[in-house]
Amino acid sequence: MIPELGHFALILATVVALIQGVLPLTGTYLPSRTLQITLQSLARPMAILQCVLVACAFAALATAFLTNDFSVTYVAQHSNSLLPKPYQFAAVWGGHEGSLLLWVLLLAVWSMAVALFSKSLPLDMVARVLGVLGLISVGFLLFILITSNPFERLLPAALDGRDLNPLLQDPGLVIHPPMLYMGYVGMSVAFAFAVAALLSGRLDAAWARWSRPWTVIAWTFLTFGIGLGSWWAYYELGWGGWWFWDPVENASLMPWLVATALIHSLMVTEKRGSFKAWTVLLAIAAFSLSLLGTFLVRSGVLTSVHAFASDPKRGVFILVFLAVVVGSSLTLFAWRAPRVTLGGRMELVSRESFLLANSVLLVVATGAVLLGTIYPLIIDALNMGKLSVGPPYFNAVFAPLLVPTVFLMVPGSIARWREAKVSEIAYTLSFSGAAAVLLAIGLPFVLGGWSLGAMLGIFLGAWVGLGTLQQVVTRLRKPGRIGLSFWGQHIAHFGIAVFVVGVTGVNSYEVERDVRMHVNDVVTIEPYSFQLKSLGEVTGPNYKAVRADVEVKRGNEVIETLQPEKRRYFSSAMPMTEAGIDTGFMRDLYVSLGEPLNDARTEWSMRVYYKPFVPWLWGGVLLMVLGGLFAALDRRYRA
């Protein structure tokens, strides 16, 4: 009965979303002022009601998982009676249908948030924004009801379920998808504000100020989600990497890059009234790329640890939806673009010009990632053979574009609006620049050897970090209140600096050993030694594992005992690797257990890593997230 109620709630939510999308938008064009206000006023209660209904549907599906209702096909496919309760709940979004329901729920949450926290915005603007969000919700709700019903019954009911994919039985699964989806879906709010501004013809500083905090919050969630996904892959997959240029990883990176450009472009539009058309295009692109990521994951065109098995009609539905969203928004833009004024004048050297250059570089980098991601799919679709585009392409094309992007962050932060002097910028940054050069020359020798990549990475990290600290110190010396947006900007920029140093350190100075080990064997990565002390079997709630005890020493001092595992799950017999990791401020020590190399299972392949600066990757991400939260909470944006 509960699954049927959940399905009915989705049907009602679709009707409510249709009302939310059609009537308020219609009301903005009626001649009667009374009728205008009446229809526009429906937007807020409809958005709240839609969120309640979708939440009821989600709760119904969660109940089916937690009660082991294997008469529901989706539950039988993605859960098991032995699955621990936290993972039973996380399994709600462990497959295609449930993850799509989570997507729709979060879209409804964003809509309700706009309805509740935009009281100072004009009613017609709120009606347009919520109307656009309502129409987007209609598209996804119809997608669920037509192709992806999570409440479909299985008769007769299965005695037990197939179990959740062992890869996903991890605490990271409980957090990573919701955070990532909050970022993905949050781009719909920036898109809705852009479309609403185009519909009203009001592309001005007020629109940018209204849109910016929502964009920053979405960017913050997306940053956190991508960081969590990278961290999960690092410790869960057992290969020690944090980014593999997987197509679905790329699908999350592309909207992040465009959203980063959008945030800074919105700032220029708010402060100077410039870049209006460019800002609108970035908002459209950010959401369109989020939809493209949805298509890549759910169409079945990709083979990936992230991708969901899917039938072709789902891919066709999303592709048509993507075409409608992009086509209609670009058509509206083309209609309104001639009426958009150019805004304030700017010189070649100014804060606006630096921010424009950076946003263009970010868009070009996005294009490079997009090309490498979809080109193999196009070649395959045209029956021109199979083509793989991997890390060599992305590292060769993407990294050179990021070097000037990161470099321009510092002068772009201190340059004056409208017009700046090169000599003034150079003088202001002379100390930071000189210190960054000295660190870039000297530190590589201290860390383990000089290379061009290490020198360049350390220079960029030091340049941004020292330049950011210099700006903070300069501002603290001046009187007056410092807004949260100032702190947010500089904390996020410092996070970029920390992240760049982390990437440089691990890429330049990582040491890896692939070894064969018996009990009591020792492998050394100076100044650490790793001794295999014992091997034993352990039993978990739904798996058995071989666990190794690896004692790590520095000299004669025992640092830690790592316990990597090789697990086999009862329901699928799928082998899984659980790495043993010791994290310090400056490095990770990482041990991964491979396969037995003899019948007696006394000799095992093992992979041992020394990973300098890896914790700085996650620290940099957390600083960016903290900066985003500070910026979004600035009192200028409270409505």
Regions found by a protein language model. Give the residues of each.
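Contiguous transmembrane helix-bundle modules in multi-pass membrane proteins
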Residues: 1-37, 56, 70, 175, ...
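A conserved hydrophobic secondary-structure block that centers on an alpha-helix together
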Residues: 11-25, 29, 99-230
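Membrane-interfacial loop-to-helix junctions in multi-pass inner-membrane proteins
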Residues: 32-54, 116-137, 199-220, 245, ...
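Hydrophobic alpha-helical membrane-insertion segments
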Residues: 49-65, 133-146, 282-290, 358-370, ...
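Membrane-interface helix-loop-helix modules in multi-pass inner-membrane proteins
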Residues: 55-130, 145-164, 226-270, 293-316, ...
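Short, aromatic-rich amphipathic segments at membrane interfaces
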Residues: 90-91, 165-170, 588-616, 620
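Soluble non-transmembrane domains of integral membrane proteins
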Residues: 514-607
